[in-house]
Amino acid sequence: MVRDSMAAAFRPSNRVLLQALQILVYPGVGGSGSVSCRCPLGAKRYLLTDNVVKLKEFQQKKVAVACNLSGTKETYFRNLKKKLTQNKLILKGELITLLHLCESRDHVELAKNVIYRYHAENKNFTLGEYKFGPLFVRLCYELDLEESAVELMKDQHLRGFFSDSTSFNILMDMLFIKGKYKSALQVLIEMKNQDVKFTKDTYVLAFAICYKLNSPESFKICTTLREEALLKGEILSRRASCFAVALALNQNEMAKAVSIFSQIMNPESIACINLNIIIHIQSNMLENLIKTLKNAAEGNLSKFVKRHVFSEEVLAKVREKVKDVPALVAKFDEIYGTLHITGQVTTDSLDAVLCHTPRDRKSHTLLLNKRMVSRRTFQPLSQSLLAE
């Protein structure tokens, strides 16, 4: 009871959070004016894995739908246009097929009109209904039409059509790739406005967007979202936390950066390792910094043990920091040489390291499970191995 009342007292209200978001995205509404993106453009990498975006599966389904279509695409489009003008009922299957047949901006314009009609006819019967949102956003992803997805997602007449987190996440990822961070933040605002549940991917995207905007306002948003998530009992991923740490460091919020970093479980990723070095640099912990690098360079020599890898950019910052301390410069130069010899230095910037998307674990599992029968005995592999 006491814990619940404390949480309620410290929980940021949606209104306050949304106001902060809107000030950042629409500077004229309030705040201190325009926001400049001070962080380097760096790697414009996607943040979502393939098993979330599912673009390949969508494209395969498009081919299958086109092959199974009775008649031509042009006839199908013409019949749908006729149904629109005659105010006839749009069926679920017709919209699904249409979204799989679209290949151009003009086709998407037709799809948008059909979506408006379909939603107007069915918005009161959405419980358990087919989720068209991800399908439309994947279509926009494929055709490079992110503005169409943003337009529909923000339209109040389509409230409830994009009721799933996947639609918002894929669109934010698409905008992130193109460096349209303010537009991505607008999508985040809309997601918050529509009370769509945030997932682990949402927090990664939200914190990455705030990190790229790199302003006092975006730092405030990131901090508020993080605190709100923790109060709800959400478990934030290591990737999300790394973006939050990097943003705090860029904003010279050292105490916050250290606090967030200390809460990361298993901080052994390349991003964590390099962020830890930056924390040491900005905290002037030079002796510990050199000791950390030395331990990494002289650690277990077994090829089966994963070694720590450091960004050349980060190591350059270390050298700049210790250049006025001759004893430390000598130690660093020796360690630097060892790290290069052992292959523990990458040319990737810290930004590229942060934005790197790990491969899907699911794909590895599928590869392992792909062949379940012995080619020699035609028995299940487990039985075959025992027999041999």
From Swiss-Prot:
GO terms for biological process: kidney development; liver development; mitochondrion organization; mRNA processing; muscle cell development; regulation of gene expression; regulation of mRNA processing; ventricular cardiac muscle tissue morphogenesis. The keyword Phosphoprotein applies. PROSITE patterns: PPR. PPR repeats lie at residues 166-200. The keyword Mitochondrion applies. Its main location: mitochondrion. InterPro entries: mS27/PTCD2, Pentatricopeptide_rpt, PTCD2, TPR-like_helical_dom_sf. Transmembrane segments: none annotated. Gene3D superfamilies: Tetratricopeptide repeat domain. The modification Phosphoserine is found at residue 382. GO terms for molecular function: RNA binding. Keywords: Mitochondrion, mRNA processing, Phosphoprotein. One of its GO terms (cellular component) is mitochondrion. It is found in: Mitochondrion. Belongs to the PTCD2 family. Involved in mitochondrial RNA maturation and mitochondrial respiratory chain function. This is Pentatricopeptide repeat-containing protein 2, mitochondrial. It comes from Homo sapiens. The gene is PTCD2.
